[in-house]
A protein has these predicted regions:
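…primarily DNA-binding HTH/wHTH and HhH modules…
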Residues: 1-5, 9-12, 90-138
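Terminal helix-turn-helix DNA-binding modules in bacterial transcription factors
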Residues: 8, 12-16, 21-25, 44-80, ...
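Short coil turns linking two alpha-helices in DNA-binding domains
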Residues: 31-35, 83-85
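Nucleotide 5′-phosphate-binding alpha/beta core
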Residues: 32, 41, 48
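Short hydrophobic/aromatic patch on the recognition helix
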Residues: 38, 42, 87-88, 92
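Short, well-ordered alpha-helical segments
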Residues: 143-151
């Protein structure tokens, strides 16, 4: 199994267990990676840790529940693993920039974080227009990252 399949397996596991306690060690076991490795892959591919990904997904699904059910905010908070109403409201406000009560309104703007999928897209065979010219000396700065797509 290559790393993209493993990351997709991790995301599927998270989605299927989003209302339960999610153990990062179990995700590591499923993906045949260490907890540090799986976390590094999430950070390098999504820019957030796996715990942040889980929190963002839970808070996104909470919006759906707020707008489409009669569940109390407290019940939704506990459903998605928050220990208190206050911690849920604080995290909700941090992600969505509105309170859970305001988010009950379907016209309210929120920041939904969709489920992640990992794939490789290869585009090519396009005609490239170019021009060769002499330039003055200049410096180039950048950041390089190497990814091993094989386990």
């Amino acid at each position: 199994m290559n790393i993209l399949n493993e990351l997709n397996e991790a995301c599927n596991y998270i989605e299927n267990n989003i209302e339960n306690e999610i153990d990062i060690k179990e995700i590591a076991r499923i993906t045949n990676q260490s907890t540090d490795s799986i976390n590094r892959f999430f950070v390098s591919m999504l820019g957030i840790t796996i715990k942040e990904y889980i929190r963002k997904r839970r808070l996104s699904l909470a919006v759906y529940d707020l707008q489409n059910s009669d569940e109390k905010i407290t019940d939704i908070a506990f459903k998605y693993g928050f220990n208190s109403y206050d911690s849920f409201c604080k995290a909700f406000l941090n992600q969505h920039h509105v309170t859970p009560t305001q988010a009950k309104n379907p016209s309210c703007e929120v920041n939904i974080f969709p489920p992640a999928t990992f794939e490789i897209n290869v585009n090519g065979a396009q005609k490239i227009k170019f021009k060769i010219c002499d330039l003055k000396e200049f410096e180039v700065y950048g950041i390089s990252k190497n990814f091993n797509c094989q386990s």
